[in-house]
Amino acid sequence: MKSLLLTILLLGLVAVLKAQEAPPDDLVDYSGIWYAKAMVHNGTLPSHKIPSIVFPVRIIALEEGDLETTVVFWNNGHCREFKFVMKKTEEPGKYTAFHNTKVIHVEKTSVNEHYIFYCEGRHNGTSSFGMGKLMGRDSGENPEAMEEFKNFIKRMNLRLENMFVPEIGDKCVESD
C-alpha cells in the first residue's frame, strides 16, 4: 500500500515539474506588437526601396502554430497595411509564406524579448531575395541585441554595409 501511495505521489511530482518546464522553442508565443530595431538585406534591395521609417508589426497566433502578421508601411504618400500568414513548418522556428515562395526563419537571441526574423526566397519569381530584421517587443535601443544581430549578419555571409537602422514610428498617419 505504501509503495502504491509513493508511486502516485512521485508521478504527481513529475507531472508538476513537467508543467513548470519552459515550453519548447516551437511553442513560443510570438503574439503581440514587435518593433524592427535593425534590418539587413542580401544586396538585392534597391536603395529607393530601403525604408527610412518603419512601424510596429502585429503578430497574432493562429491555430496549428501559424502566425497572422500585419505590416504597415509608407508608400507613395499613403499608409499601406499588408497582412499575410506565416505557415508553421515541422522545423521549429521555420515558417513559409506567399504560397511557399518565401521561407521565414525566427531565431531567438540571448537578449530577452528579442528575435531575428530572416526571410528568403525568390522576388517576383526571378532574383534571390533575403532580408533580416532584429525585432524586439519594445522600441528602445539595445546594444547587446544589436551586437548579436551583427554576428548573425556575419554568420549568414551578409554584408554589414547592407545593415540599416530605420526610424521607428508609433503609427502611420497620412498628412493632408
From Swiss-Prot:
Q: Where, by tissue, is this protein expressed?
A: Expressed in the liver (at protein level). Expressed in epididymis.
Keyword tags: Disulfide bond, Glycoprotein, Secreted, Signal, Transport
- In this protein, the residues bearing a glycan are N42, N124
Q: Name one GO cellular component term.
A: extracellular space
Q: Name one GO biological process term.
A: insulin receptor signaling pathway
InterPro entries assigned: Calycin, Lipocalin, Lipocln_cytosolic_FA-bd_dom, von_Ebner_gland
Instruction: Keyword check for Disulfide bond, yes or no.
Output: yes
**Which first-to-last residue range defines the signal peptide?**
1-19
Query: Where are the disulfide bridges?
Result: C79-C172
Give the free-text miscellaneous remark of the entry: May be involved in the development of hepatic steatosis during obesity.
Protein name from the UniProt record: Odorant-binding protein 2a
Which species is this record about?
A: Mus musculus (Mouse)
What does the organism's lineage look like at the top? Eukaryota, Metazoa, Chordata, Craniata, Vertebrata
Q: Which gene encodes it?
A: Obp2a
